[in-house]
Amino acid sequence: MFENITAAPADPILGLADLFRADDRPGKINLGIGVYKDETGKTPVLTSVKKAEQYLLENETTKNYLGIDGIPEFARCTQELLFGKGSALINDKRARTAQTPGGTGALRIAADFLAKNTPVKRVWVSNPSWPNHKSVFNAAGLEVREYAYYDAENHSLDFEALQASLSEAQAGDVVLFHGCCHNPTGIDPTLEQWQVLAELSVEKGWLPLFDFAYQGFARGLEEDAEGLRAFAALHKELIVASSYSKNFGLYNERVGACTLVAADAETVDRAFSQMKSAIRANYSNPPAHGASIVATILSNDALRAIWEQELTDMRQRIQRMRQLFVNTLQEKGANRDFSFIIKQNGMFSFSGLTKDQVLRLREEFGVYAVASGRVNVAGMTPDNMAPLCEAIVAVL
């Protein structure tokens, strides 16, 4: 039965990590997978996380199963982070949150819930987007369409083309937006543009689905939620898939959340019962450790202050690396202007490198980037910057 199965293609991002591990060149550089690295090239455990883990170690009394939707305090903290303390939407009990195995788990639960319980048939994602978006929605039986996003010539958001391509989206279609730090371009709408999109979305009858994996990495926790909150102020219904992998450094704990918003408390409770049903048929209930860390930090003022400072430090380090990257490319004689990289948000930069140039970087210089030309700025350090930029200049 199994002998006739053909091999699946390697994942474009995780497959790259396997190639990197197998490379024995000492000066190799990994700018592929989206994890934060510090100045020494390590992915650290945050101090706030260590302190929360110590607290949990001393105070945890059971390893019993969680409920289907996870830890209630985690859900409460998640909603406050997304919609703001004292949000009317929270006070009116219009939101319900399920703790999920990572942001990917949240997206898949949202997809399964929509496919089974609503007339939704189509999901619109930006071109380009995170490659796994298409796989997740297709796996749930939903059609994926693309809307224009990136102006490659000017390295900017092509807002006119975005609006024009979304004019084909029909009432009842899902439109997926990146909450901030658009992956892979690093280019986000302005608040005014978010406002236009929120109004257009209501007018056209789309269901907004926010993929929110990088809150705190663009400008700050509150600022990065402005786009989502513009939608939440106007929409009766929306879904948010959020992740704590990046902003808490909890990559291997798989901590995510799927938040459902409806017109009133009674409707959201009824709809959420079906979301829980989708979870039960998938993984039954989520693991406790990572979400316990997040809930512990967010509900403790002292730990939260440490975490917010650590998040600020991570964000500022990435911004410094963007500046250093652009300066060093110039110093090494790059024959084109890379200053647009400074304006991008979050971990990633859409470098403008071609597939062939990316391949040459890997084969000749041991520099690993995604074929699309996306590079992880958080993988850059003052030590690897010169060899990295020399390699890029050599392949331009």
Curated annotation (Swiss-Prot):
Superkingdom of the source species: Bacteria
GO cellular component: cytosol
EC class (word): transferase
EC numbers for this chain: 2.6.1.1
Binding site for L-aspartate: 34, 130, 183, 374
Residues where N6-(pyridoxal phosphate)lysine is found: 246
Major subcellular location class: cytoplasm
Pfam families linked: Aminotran_1_2 (PF00155)
GO-annotated biological processes: L-phenylalanine biosynthetic process from chorismate via phenylpyruvate
Transcription recorded as keyword: no
Subcellular location: Cytoplasm
UniProt keyword annotation of Glycosyltransferase present: no
Catalysed transformations (reactions): L-aspartate + 2-oxoglutarate = oxaloacetate + L-glutamate
Keywords linked to the UniProt accession: Aminotransferase, Cytoplasm, Pyridoxal phosphate, Transferase
Subunit and interaction comment: Homodimer.
Protein name, per record: Aspartate aminotransferase
Organism: Salmonella typhi
